[in-house]
Amino acid sequence: MARSSKLLVAMQGKGVFVIDLVERSVVSGLHDCIVVAPSPDNGETFFAGTDKGQYKSTDGGRNWQLKGLEQYKIFSLAFHPSDPKTIYAGTEPALLFRSRDGGETWTELDGVRKLPGRSKWCYPAPPYIAHIKGIAIHPEDPEVMYCSIEEGGVIQSLDAGESWRYVS
């Protein structure tokens, strides 16, 4: 993982703030951000999920480019532990997408869509749509993944997100 002197702070409705701890400067931008994640192989590349899709910055957060999934709210992001070009995005409605090219293109992993009982997932506040709130990938066995569904429980994949089962 690349080391960086930058601290990312995402505040929903306020934007992404990139604080440079060496230069003691702050860069702000990209409002409506829900989640932000630094690239593990480059201290200047950041990814952000918003209520209007997936964004990427390659210049330390100064500029952002929309990189797809614009019809979804992005609630969670996770990087493959040994392949920094592979990124997972959890959305509202509760779907899971994967990019194998550093966030340039995205493919839905439809195993989440096929889970029985999915129609009962419901977020308790309007608009009552469940979303994938968290994604965790086992650091030594990236075939093993977990997603938390708000509200719907925790699901597990043993094949890098292709199929899923409930664990709670």
Residue ranges and their predicted role:
Residues 1-168:
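Extracellular glycan-interacting surfaces
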